[in-house]
From Swiss-Prot:
GO terms for molecular function: cholest-4-en-3-one 26-monooxygenase activity; heme binding; iron ion binding; steroid hydroxylase activity. InterPro entries: Cyt_P450 (IPR001128), Cyt_P450_B (IPR002397), Cyt_P450_CS (IPR017972), Cyt_P450_sf (IPR036396). This is Putative cytochrome P450 126. The gene is cyp126. It comes from Mycobacterium tuberculosis (strain ATCC 25618 / H37Rv). The lineage of its organism: Bacteria, Bacillati, Actinomycetota, Actinomycetes, Mycobacteriales. Keywords: Heme, Iron, Metal-binding, Monooxygenase, Oxidoreductase.
Amino acid sequence: MTTAAGLSGIDLTDLDNFADGFPHHLFAIHRREAPVYWHRPTEHTPDGEGFWSVATYAETLEVLRDPVTYSSVTGGQRRFGGTVLQDLPVAGQVLNMMDDPRHTRIRRLVSSGLTPRMIRRVEDDLRRRARGLLDGVEPGAPFDFVVEIAAELPMQMICILLGVPETDRHWLFEAVEPGFDFRGSRRATMPRLNVEDAGSRLYTYALELIAGKRAEPADDMLSVVANATIDDPDAPALSDAELYLFFHLLFSAGAETTRNSIAGGLLALAENPDQLQTLRSDFELLPTAIEEIVRWTSPSPSKRRTASRAVSLGGQPIEAGQKVVVWEGSANRDPSVFDRADEFDITRKPNPHLGFGQGVHYCLGANLARLELRVLFEELLSRFGSVRVVEPAEWTRSNRHTGIRHLVVELRGG
């Protein structure tokens, strides 16, 4: 099995390598020297298990499009961060850790609660909330864009979609805040909870909310999913545990990844003021700009799968049961697919990025994320013509989320 010499000193499970954002310089070496190679376990690998690391676009796409060979059951999110190598007892119960046929049945059910009509219905509310947040920005005064806007807007929208009562949202933001690694919120009016306490409170709250949606359904996504039936004689409806995992997944996938795209997008525009001015002068470019922001930020940069059978990938022999980690964050900078891959270009077209995934696990909330990005940047750039980064961005120390924890900026008109 290939263990590239040039990569032997690089540990992709050492989160220090991700402390300043996604390490594109390391993955450039990875793509060039060994697109698919065996990553030996290290002291930073929690389960002590090696894995196949995949850095190039073609091979990443091959894995994502073949869910039979590359199983998701032991992949997906990890409750306490960690690395892309940990298995969880909930594997197979949450949507992004399911295989077919149940995955397709559950996905169809969830999709019924996230229709284009429902997304269009929230646009006016989304714009009103975006304007309200921007009203609080004093031109020329430094503020933390992540805490005040990028984290705030997606969380509010997820609460609307799930039917969380307005009176509960303030409490809920504070309860889940530790799990999303937000710090310094202006809403910090209660003692910080540790991650375990936050998870426990969220679980209790979610079950009570689910029970209420079953008893008195409303016009929201959680009501649709909680009362729907599945074409599965062994499990015709979602259990409370599955509904909680769905609730939690929407918070993490719907709030955190959109937060990361918004914050990373503003940073990219600040670092490329010519692109900011081009976009500000022509909002018709917003659709391509949004796709470039998602490619550039790659907010969910890695996925882990397990080979269900022996297979060859990129010329390397993978055995059944071995782990395979694909890095969309690297694939989205593959120069064999993207011209000037390391340049931020809001006019880039075509832009076949993998920022929303691919195949059967393509992001269900992609259109909602696009809407949030479009509305926020449209409103922001209508008011402000320049962005100055006051302090270096503080990144999350993670190889599964490319996120900015704090971004202190000044916004000015003109």
